Amino acid sequence: NLTAGTEYQAAEATLRLLAASQNQVKDSAGYLATLARLAGNTGKTDYWDELINRTVRKDGFADERLRLDVYRLRQVVGITLEADEIGDMAYRANQAGLPAEAQALLDDGFKSGLLGKGTNAAADQKLRESATKAAAQDRATLADSEAAAQKAANGNALVGLGMALSSTGAHERGLALITQGIAKAGLRRADDAQLHLGLVALRAGKADQAKAAFAAVQGADGAADLARLYLLHIDSP
């Protein structure tokens, strides 16, 4: 529909003008809100990129701790990661006890030709070998890990194992374990667990469950900001 398309472009142009004026007068909150409308209404990755970058730079955002989650969000909204970002994301996933996630990232990076060349070639290959070996060990000890997690006094191990399972593609099983872990309580970071529950529900194709999980994320260290951006993405046309 040509008329609808023209109206759509006019609305985007109006929002861009508003964003420009807000940026000029240093109205950071207003600019961020307008960026969110642009990203949500158009789905354009340029807007999403700027929105995520601005969100991460907010005061109090735990960027170092949440960097892996920021990378995940960037991928979900369709932003293509650069070679150094893929390497960093894989390194952080491996450090977080998610070698299967790291291996998948590295395998894709090597396949696309982004990784394994230049000055980082040796480091990329070493990380890939390490992640591949650790992922194989995880798969071999899965039953024992789950039994130990079920017996634990708190839900931390269940949440971690749920994320690990999801990173192998077993999203339904991962979702069940994270849900059990949250119910068991005693979590080190309950909001992070809730954020990860939403992510795994989204991976499993359960949008309503993902929305409920993201809506429950609280706190002021950045997890709730990421959850709100996931909600914006889910509700985008």
Which functions belong to the PLM regions below?
Residues 5-17, 25-32, 42-52, 63-67, ...:
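Generic helix N-cap/helix-start motif at coil->alpha-helix transitions
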Residues 22, 55-56, 92-93, 165, ...:
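Residue at a conserved register position within TPR or TPR-like alpha-solenoid repeats
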Residues 19, 35-38, 57-58, 74-75, ...:
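Feature captures outer-membrane beta-barrel proteins of Gram-negative bacteria and organelles
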Residues 93, 105, 109-112, 117-118, ...:
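Flexible, glycine-rich surface segments
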Residues 153-237:
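C-terminal soluble interaction/assembly domains
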Residues 1-2, 27-41, 63-76, 101-110, ...:
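Alpha-helical repeat scaffolds
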Residues 55-59, 110, 131, 235:
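Alpha-solenoid repeat junctions
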